[in-house]
Amino acid sequence: MHDNEIKQEIFETPDLGIAAFLLVKGCKLLVAERSKGRYSFVFEDRTKCATLALEYVNSDFSKFDAALKNLKNLIR
């Protein structure tokens, strides 16, 4: 399998909320790293993860994540 084919099979996101949601939904995490202050989470099965990422945006999980961010901003 070539690098290009592998990239088409993975799903990558810098978003911690989406990454947590994908884990809860049973997606397999391949890589988790932080570089230059930016997160990177890589999962297998791009199609499944892309579908679930869209589901996340319309879910209560997303609302919960937004509320956490707002609370953190209040106490900074």
Can you annotate each of these PLM segments?
Residues 24-49:
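A short, structured beta-strand/loop element
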Residues 2-7, 16, 52-76:
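C-terminal basic regulatory modules in eukaryotic proteins
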Residues 11, 21, 41-43, 56, ...:
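Aromatic side chains
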